[in-house]
């Protein structure tokens, strides 16, 4: 099957995101509000995670094993990442839009965050871990990177208790569209 990568990127640039349903049918979705991970002083994390960061047990990499991160994100009891969506992520990666932000412990992939970068927007698609704290360390290090690279926002799409612990907050669609427009005007590089 052929995919129009430009049209897919345009869908994300308009504020939509792809998800597969329980029958693996892929559709575009929107939301009345989005969840942002703060890139300012509102970002926080548990003190216990600071101890892990101080121990420097993990190293960070970008796109060292993109396909393993996609597979890790898809490998759960209920997933919205169908085999078709995995192919699309691979094509977005090859086109310079999809990235994996990874933590490693030696030669073992500890965790990662799968995201799409368009301008100054980082759109987090999913995250996973294989080693405890692996994805949490990835979150902290990714926020540091996005700050350094002057990204406008980190869109985590949907709120959950895990993200709340990092200071995640909701943005109504009108506000999201304004910030998205600002992000699209900025040329940011994750790498």
Swiss-Prot record:
Q: Which EC class, in a word? A: transferase
- Record field: catalytic activity: N-terminal L-lysyl-[protein] + L-leucyl-tRNA(Leu) = N-terminal L-leucyl-L-lysyl-[protein] + tRNA(Leu) + H(+); N-terminal L-arginyl-[protein] + L-leucyl-tRNA(Leu) = N-terminal L-leucyl-L-arginyl-[protein] + tRNA(Leu) + H(+); L-phenylalanyl-tRNA(Phe) + an N-terminal L-alpha-aminoacyl-[protein] = an N-terminal L-phenylalanyl-L-alpha-aminoacyl-[protein] + tRNA(Phe)
A Pfam family cross-referenced in the UniProt record is: Leu_Phe_trans
- Keyword Hydrolase included in the entry's annotation: no
Which keywords does the record carry? Acyltransferase, Cytoplasm, Transferase
Report the locations given in the UniProt record.
Answer: Cytoplasm
GO cellular component terms?
cytoplasm
Question: What EC number(s) are associated with this protein in UniProt?
Answer: 2.3.2.6
Any one of the GO BP annotations = protein catabolic process
Q: Name one GO molecular function term.
A: leucyl-tRNA--protein transferase activity
Database matches in InterPro entries: Acyl_CoA_acyltransferase, Leu/Phe-tRNA_Trfase, Leu/Phe-tRNA_Trfase_C
Q: Please give the NCBIfam families that the UniProt record associates with this protein.
A: aat
HAMAP family, per the entry: Leu_Phe_trans
Role of this protein: Functions in the N-end rule pathway of protein degradation where it conjugates Leu, Phe and, less efficiently, Met from aminoacyl-tRNAs to the N-termini of proteins containing an N-terminal arginine or lysine.
- What family name appears in the similarity comment? Belongs to the L/F-transferase family.
Q: What is this protein called?
A: Leucyl/phenylalanyl-tRNA--protein transferase
Q: What is the lineage of its organism?
A: Bacteria, Bacillati, Cyanobacteriota, Cyanophyceae, Nostocales
């Amino acid at each position: 099957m052929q995919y129009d990568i430009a049209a897919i990127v345009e869908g994300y640039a308009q504020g939509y995101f792809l998800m597969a349903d329980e029958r693996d049918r892929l559709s575009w979705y929107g939301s009345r509000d989005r969840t942002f991970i703060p890139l300012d002083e509102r970002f926080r994390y548990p003190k216990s995670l600071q101890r892990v960061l101080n121990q420097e047990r993990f190293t960070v990499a970008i796109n060292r094993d993109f396909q393993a991160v996609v597979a890790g994100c898809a490998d759960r009891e209920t997933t919205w990442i169908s085999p078709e969506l995995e192919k699309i992520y691979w094509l977005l990666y090859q086109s310079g839009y999809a990235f994996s932000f990874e933590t490693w412990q030696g030669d073992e992939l500890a965790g990662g965050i799968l995201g799409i970068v368009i301008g100054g927007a980082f759109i987090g698609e999913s995250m996973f871990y294989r080693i405890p704290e692996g994805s949490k360390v990835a979150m902290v290090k990714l926020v540091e990177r996005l700050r350094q690279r002057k990204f406008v926002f980190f869109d985590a799409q949907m709120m959950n208790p895990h993200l709340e612990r990092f200071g995640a907050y909701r943005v109504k669609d009108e506000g999201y569209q304004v910030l998205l427009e600002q992000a699209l005007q900025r040329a940011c590089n994750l790498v």
